[in-house]
Curated annotation (Swiss-Prot):
This is Calcineurin B homologous protein 2. The gene is Chp2. The modification Phosphoserine is found at residue 27. A motif (Nuclear export signal) lies at residues 137-148. It is found in: Cytoplasm; Nucleus; Cell membrane. InterPro entries: Calcineurin_B_homologous, EF-hand-dom_pair, EF_Hand_1_Ca_BS, EF_hand_dom. Residues 26-61, 71-106, 111-146, 152-187 form the EF-hand domain. It comes from Mus musculus (Mouse). Ca(2+) 1 binds at residues 124, 126, 128, 130, 135.
């Protein structure tokens, strides 16, 4: 790895990325090394194929959807800033930072609301602001695989949408999604401890 260095100053726009993501310099340096390791051809960016080589994503039923979140608007190249930005959603919430946060500043990427927005977009494939019954069925099918019959899966889907759908339109809006997850500790469930 001769040309690859471990100095923080080599990361393009490091200060901007640090402010946007909330990552410490040490965490950014670790992420940058991971980014470089995934960039086997030293192109300076990652492709979908590079991310598909990550074992945890390869076996995750939502792996393809998670990978899609790294490539917004049909982009084909993922630079380090985008890589760090998506991973920032999974950064644990630091209670001290939350209490000291300037309300005039944008909400941190790892806030409860932003974690929920990230999760919502994994379901809302057509980006219409609602999770349709069909979208919910697709996600549940990915998650349970062949462990349940199609009939059971249809029933689970109908019940899930029905319980969350407060306005009776047959779909789950973002507001309904957040209300349905009020009691869930999303801050913990959507955090990766190594991402501080």
């Amino acid at each position: 790895m001769g040309s690859r260095s471990s100095h923080i100053a080599l990361i393009p726009d490091v200060e901007h990325i640090r402010r946007e993501t909330g990552f410490s310099q040490a965490s950014l340096l670790r992420l940058y090394h991971r980014f470089q390791a995934l960039d086997r051809d030293e192109k300076g960016f990652l492709s979908r194929l590079d991310l598909q080589q990550i074992g945890a994503l390869a076996v995750n039923p939502l792996g393809d959807r998670i990978i899609d979140s790294f490539f917004p608007n049909g982009s084909q190249r993922l630079y380090f800033a985008g890589f760090a930005r998506v991973l920032a959603y999974f950064r644990p919430i630091d209670e001290e930072d939350a209490t000291l946060r300037d309300p005039k500043q944008p909400e941190p990427l790892n806030s409860r609301m932003n974690k929920l927005r990230f999760a919502f977009q994994l379901y809302d494939l057509d980006r219409d602001g609602k999770i349709s019954r069909n979208e919910m069925l697709q996600v549940l099918r990915l998650m349970v695989g062949v462990q349940v019959t199609d009939e059971q899966l249809e029933s689970i889907t109908d019940r899930t949408v029905q319980e969350a759908d407060e306005d009776g339109d047959g779909a789950v809006s973002f507001l309904e999604f957040t209300k349905s997850l009020e009691k869930m500790n999303i801050e913990q469930k959507m955090s990766i401890r190594i991402l501080k």
